[in-house]
Amino acid sequence: MTADYSFLKSFAEYIIDKLGKDTKVQIILPNNFSCLELKKILTDKYKIKLPIIIPFNSLISKKIDSDYISKIEELLILSSIITEYKELPLNKNESLKAAELLRKLFNDLIINNIDIKLIEVYNNSNYWQKIYKFLEYCFLRWQEEISFTQKQTKAVYKLKLLQEEIIKIKTGHKQVILAGIFKPNVFFKRFEEELKDYIIHYNPASKQISDGISYYEPNDIYEETKQISYICSRNKDRRIAIVTNNNKLKRVYCNFLDKYEDLLGNDLRLTNIGELLTSIIKILCNNFDLKLLFLLLKNPLINCPTVQQLELMLSNKNRFISSPKYLLQLQFDNEDIREYCRNLIDILFTDTPHNIQAILTLTKEITEKLLPTIWEKEGGAELLEFLTNLTAYSKYINSTDKKDFPKIFSFLLSNIKYYKNTDAASIIIGRPEDLALCEFDLIILPHFNNENWTLSAKAHPWLSKQALQILNIDYDEIAPTLYSDYFNLFLQNKQIVILNAKKYDGKLSVPSNLFLKLEKGSVSPRDLITGSSNYMDTVVKPRYDKSIEIHSPSFPTTLSVTEIETLIKNPYGFYAKKILGLRKKDHIWEEPKISDFGNLIHKVLEEYSKNYDKQYINLNLLDKQNALINIGNHILYSTILPSYTKKTWQIKLTAFSKAFILFDIERRKNCKEIYFETKGELRLNIVGQDIKIIGIADRIEISKSNNITILDYKTGTIPTKKEIELGLSPQLIIESLMLLENGFTKCNSLSLLCHPQPLLCYSRESRNPVINNNITIAYVKITSTEPYVHTTEITLSIETLNRHKAGLVKLLEHYITNQFFSYDLNLSKYNDYLHLSR
């Protein structure tokens, strides 16, 4: 059957029929949204003078700023007390989280008139006794500090308001109607008990559920979100309720919706204006950091094209600048960017606040300079009030370490909500208790599983189960049928869609027990839209066949040995980098990479090796080691890097320095010539096109017996022997071919020694040629752990090198002739261009 029951409409009829138009009555509903809905029904349909219709919370929420202590001040007072308790050492951030729990506990003790000293007699466990002593200390100090403020706690103030309302109802002989389903709490229970002779209860009727119930299990939460968006887009002319009490999921759903009314509220910390203030505070509380600076500048409220241009300028090596003054030393393309940097430095880095109050005051000033209209933005009024209050209460946190304050600020800000609502929105997002009494054309129950729709008792962190029972403080006093009652009311709407993603946060979802109780025949498994056989196609089809190749009419004339390796392993990456000229920039937030450390080691070893004969040859082992370390420190000092990276790399350099000196001394014993960072080239003519392959050999050794070894220093992964034999790692092979072709022209000895057919090695003393049919290639792995230096050597014969040369020629012929570069061949471990080939 089609559902025709509406609780509020039924209640409106009850008001007219049973009470009459002129009856004086006070109607109390569970929440404000239900009150607004009921008023609308009464005015639109019955045209009557409205009785008093209020939510229960309004009885205890009249506010005058001076009447009670604010939540923020109370949390700060409690956290200060917790921090001063030496037997349970907690930092300021941890103490704030503990303060939130203690605040509720202490207020419950006060409201229920329970003596804190009673709790220590309920459990003789040594652990719990320590906890109870801590609680007693905090409670007594909390009462003392609250008395100094000459204000009441909010809970005591609420109790006072409630008592005043109870007296007013009794003396005025008012009739009170409690309509709907109320979440029980200490205030509501007291209200019911004291006014039992004045209260009329109007509860929802149990009706037959709708036959328009559909159930679907998307694969994950993002597919579930798309389903919600799809349903809403197909039902724009209908009134829709999305029921959830999960704020995190709500934010995901809202990303796919246009107009909606949000009854859950937004965490002010997660809004653009909240993140703007948090970013400024992080900058003021820490040493200069480009990542923190751009976290601020890329906020949507102040981001602009100049920020994007500046980010490009500061990518790669400039991303490690350690002071704002370096911003003005950049080579600017135009004066506008320079002026932007100058203004930025004046606003952010001119003043240095020394305590929390000064930080908060300066934060407000900086915010208004960066965005003069900030307080007019959504949530601006709430944020300004929060900032003003926190500044006033900063005496409780002035002793906090500056670096800890951003976390404290963020935690406190997370306690503040603001509500963003769209006029005339047909989509309402709210909790079950907000929406259960109202009528909708379509109800969507997303993420309908035990996590969200089954109440489970949780252990209290500060009280044992026995203590809770004896003290009669029930933290899980919500009636077990509460969510079942909400669910039954939702099922009496016209159409209900139940969704439950199969996975969430990497875990499988378990359907709610409430859903399992439904009769099988009452639920349609998929068809939510009449006449639609497929609910939603969630499979994204590829835009093209991945085997398609890219065509290029030209081929480069100069290649490096590393580009040859890219051509072999990742043709599309070669095309993007070498032909299109695309280069990956290291973003500002990227940490120094292992390749950056490798570049440092190459510079250090080059500097040491090239000056060895002039400066270090006669030094002892320790002095040589110190010389190597000093070279590294000098290079690090002149390199822009984060200070923590410099310290880490200094430690690594010191760790392997002795092992490298011993390695170097041992290698030199059998060498008569050594060349370092030597440039070479290999010239080829491929199908009429001249190709030059260039490379730099880290180290080339000529032994006393005229054997040649080419060495390559590696701080990263070295290729396997199989990869070298197959030509997948051709760097040292191509450098060996350069030797055969006399490609190292600046090294006279190599030119004399090398000739391609076969490799002739001449004795410099006798000038008589000695046939040598091999070249040795060696990878020297350098690490900061033992073994610090490890050498892998492979001997390549002339015949093997000639086969590799033929393979190289064939490879180049293929690409020069065919002019196609495949998408789907990718053997690289690291691929900066993978996203471009999709």
UniProtKB/Swiss-Prot annotation:
Which top-rank group of organisms is this from? Bacteria
* Name of the protein in its database record: Uncharacterized protein RC0550
Origin species, per record, is: Rickettsia conorii (strain ATCC VR-613 / Malish 7)
